[in-house]
UniProtKB/Swiss-Prot annotation:
Its EC number is 2.7.1.71. PROSITE patterns: SHIKIMATE_KINASE. It comes from Oryza sativa subsp. japonica (Rice). GO terms for molecular function: ATP binding; metal ion binding; shikimate kinase activity. Keywords: Amino-acid biosynthesis, Aromatic amino acid biosynthesis, ATP-binding, Chloroplast, Kinase, Magnesium, Metal-binding, Nucleotide-binding, Plastid, Transferase, Transit peptide. This is Shikimate kinase 1, chloroplastic. Residues 1-62 form a transit peptide. Pfam families: SKI. Induction: By chitin oligosaccharide elicitor.
Amino acid sequence: MEAGVGLALQSRAAGFGGSDRRRSALYGGEGRARIGSLRVAEPAVAKAAVWARGSKPVAPLRAKKSSGGHETLHNSVDEALLLKRKSEEVLFYLNGRCIYLVGMMGSGKSTVGKIMSEVLGYSFFDSDKLVEQAVGMPSVAQIFKVHSEAFFRDNESSVLRDLSSMKRLVVATGGGAVIRPVNWKYMKKGLSVWLDVPLDALARRIAKVGTASRPLLDQPSGDPYTMAFSKLSMLAEQRGDAYANADVRVSLEEIASKQGHDDVSKLTPTDIAIESFHKIENFVIEHTVDNPVGDSQADSRAQRIQTL
């Protein structure tokens, strides 16, 4: 068994007001903590330490080129306004609950997650990055190489456990986080959103940027697209049922079809974020029929939306 010692905060913040926002602190590479009261955790699991509101504030989003097949973040002012409106509607229903984005590698979870977190006023975390910082290694690929996939998965579960005790977060999970039932236990404390991207689009994105940072796809030789598509197809078959456990499925093919596109690469991350908010709102409304909000709250929300 891989040996390792993790540290975790004994107390974690659970709700964060706008007046007491504080930056998070994460463990350094040599098992040193920068803040907080610490305890030694069980062997072989290096735990992410998270305090207060989460990660560093996300920088303002601007239209720009993207290496993932998306040309811009916002196509127009109208799109940005729609994003803001949908986020305000969803915020009412979320009541501080976290959002966990799941999906295959290259599906845009981090890009879309940053957009969603900024407009919601939430903090954003990439679970892979938290594992890297907790273990003290620069990449997931190196963790796989030096330790093992199982070692990485143990730490990934520990990170998700720590995050699940918090509120007002958007979390981009690793592509394989869904394969462990315990991770669903943690993610079900919030709302899970599956970004469902066609395999062809995923393979094109990954072939374009390379596979060195993706240990499950990295191959010594062969056509990048063909190799990526073959491996992604195998992973999709293994994980398909697990992804379907998500509360919400956001199909990029469906979004593209509604917009009259024949290629999902024509969608912007903002398109995907807007659809995600729409699906989240529908899901929460459907699942709160037996526990509706009070009349005064509903009236207040209706008046607020009408003024937008």
